[in-house]
Amino acid sequence: MNHIRNFSIIAHIDHGKSTLADRLIQRCGGLADRDMEAQVLDSMDIEKERGITIKAQTAALQYKAKDGQVYNLNLIDTPGHVDFSYEVSRSLSACEGALLVVDASQGVEAQTVANCYTALELGVEVTAVLNKMDLPQADPENARAEIEDVIGIDASDAIPCSAKTGMGIEEILEAVVAKVPPPKGDPNGQLRAMIIDSWFDTYVGVVMLVRVVDGELKRGERFKMMASGAAYEANNLGVFTPADVPRDVLRAGEVGYIIAGIKELKAAKVGDTITLEKKLPNNLGPATEALPGFKEIKPQVFAGLYPTEASEYDQLRDALEKLQLNDSSLQFEPEVSQALGFGFRCGFLGLLHMEIVQERLEREFDQDLITTAPSVVYEVVKGDGEVIQVENPSKMPDAGRIEEVREPIVTVHLYMPQDYVGPVMTLANQKRGVQINMQYHGRQVMLTYEMPLGEIVLDFFDKLKSVSRGYASMDYEFKEYRASDVVKVDILLNGEKVDALSIIVHRSQATYRGRAVVAKMREIISRQMFDVAIQAAIGANIIARETVKAMRKNVLAKCYGGDITRKRKLLEKQKAGKKRMKQIGSVEVPQEAFLAILQVED
């Protein structure tokens, strides 16, 4: 036990934690040099392409320290993006120590702070590391000052390193051995292990990544999940060094995998405790108390996902279920839309999470999807005092039956160099933000705002990056529901409501957003044989209208000269025909129309 160290790496996006992990693995000989590729732990293609870590991955490394002892280091890589903060808290709860990696040329950024606080709350020992020291613009003194100033941990002995050139890697490993406490737990007690992650493998079923806290699990023993009571046999055990290495037993303090022929991802709930099924002569029997898990994560952003072909509904459901296996925060339920048919209402942690899920469905499962505009959950107090949660604009009751609508307010922390404070404040005010606080840390400024989540969901992050030339970073946490004057804007095509295009916006922006959506729709809907009226309405009030003019044949082409009445007769006849068509004709709404709502510029 004393020679085991469990640690993870926390950092803001692009501060180089995956590269650092590569170097640590290489130094400890976890992979042969020829298997060593950039970002070994980012195993999904989409992680490599976007250069972000989404799933937590692990590597068990053997390190011979300067004191001559061999230590087992379990490295758990964590994502840095705010949407995946639950992955971070999960990884950290399995560790005793964390390396806080800060880019020496950029200093502390928003998610670094958020993840670092998570670590400190969980009582993890945090060691600061200054990465990218090989860059000419690296400024270690400033970065140290910022770490002490913003996060409040001692950075005087922060380790300078460069994951690219390999400088400082030895020092980091020595620091892990010296500073990170060995795992607490009873190696001779009853088995208790926590599921840190689970994913589905087509050959062996569900693979569970566990951290053994007390006792040990041998191959072939039967174990049970404490939450559900379901029991399985441990067919295979092992550890990842990122490559998988089978073992006969997993002991207290180790992080490894269990394969037990489980078919359902739902059975292996992340955060659940595993213990032995029953008392046998050769074991200690089941534990009575489960380990404290982590809190269930609540989705913040909702959107509808629909298959382009109605017949692919079942495949989409299978795909979502498989994704949910290793992305426990994705939630979905079936829903029906008049415009789009059968599909699912999905809950995500944030916008990036939504994009990733969509992209994984398209790539890994070959799904063609239509996505509706993302919306957040509103609390609606009805006239009779009943409070309901509305996460889909089409479920919003009529204005007459509503007493008040409350929208979710979040506290947003924005970090940026002081040159960009002006534009960022303007942006935050446009989004109905209320400034709570402003602090200067050296050249960096931290602004704290309270803002409606609904404003952030659409495009706040992209706008923030563009007004600050990519320097600003943000993270947010939910604060409360507050009464607000929000209304539902419906889009009508030839007088018919298209439920999937409804949006919920603040009354002050309703007219503007309505006009913008309608104008955008006009460009997208192709011309028909009859006029198409596109309207935006609040209740029965029409607030904007555009018309897509009909295509028509030149019916007068065959008249040479001749009387005006003859021409008029032909035109009237054409008009009557168009009118008849309009009554029975239906308008196809192309996929772009649903995306148009997302791209309405402010």
UniProtKB/Swiss-Prot annotation:
Alphabetical UniProt keywords: Cell inner membrane, Cell membrane, GTP-binding, Hydrolase, Membrane, Nucleotide-binding, Protein biosynthesis
SUPFAM superfamilies: EF-G C-terminal domain-like, P-loop containing nucleoside triphosphate hydrolases, Translation proteins
Alphabetical GO biological process terms: positive regulation of translation
Enzyme nomenclature, EC number: 3.6.5.n1
Residues annotated to bind GTP: 14-19, 131-134
Major enzyme class: hydrolase
Membrane topology: Peripheral membrane protein
Pfam families: EFG_C, GTP_EFTU, GTP_EFTU_D2, LepA_C
A GO CC annotation given for this chain: plasma membrane
Family statement: Belongs to the TRAFAC class translation factor GTPase superfamily. Classic translation factor GTPase family. LepA subfamily.
Protein name according to UniProt: Elongation factor 4
Species, as recorded: Delftia acidovorans (strain DSM 14801 / SPH-1)
